[in-house]
């Protein structure tokens, strides 16, 4: 999916009644972490606006003074939650300082598969 098709994805989600997005990543222990983002912030979310302090994530090798980690949702992974139809879930890659964050589980799997 290209950036040009993101407005169509947003429109489709809104037409299906989605009010919130849930960009999600998996921590080192296999636990899913996410944030609720209003659909009105979709464009910013897809550009990586959702931040978290890497030092607060268990198992992530960062200090408190390090750059925050941003969540970059994968538009190909989107699903509308069957039990909560106004929420769209996205698998996300973590980025730090403008590049993929090595400890991110999706980035590790991508490297293994490459």
What do the PLM-derived regions correspond to, one by one?
Residues 1-114:
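ATP/Mg2+-dependent ligation/transfer catalytic cores
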């Amino acid at each position: 999916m290209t950036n040009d098709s993101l407005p169509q994805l947003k429109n489709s989600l809104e037409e299906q009644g989605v009010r919130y997005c849930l960009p999600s990543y998996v921590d080192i222990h296999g636990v899913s972490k996410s944030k609720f983002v209003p659909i009105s912030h979709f464009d910013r979310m897809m550009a990586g606006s959702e931040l978290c302090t890497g030092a607060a994530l268990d198992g992530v090798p960062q200090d408190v003074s390090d750059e925050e980690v941003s969540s970059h949702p994968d538009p190909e992974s989107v699903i509308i939650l069957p039990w909560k139809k106004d929420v769209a879930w996205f698998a996300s890659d973590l980025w730090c300082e403008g590049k993929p964050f090595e400890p991110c589980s999706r980035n590790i799997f991508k490297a293994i598969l490459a």
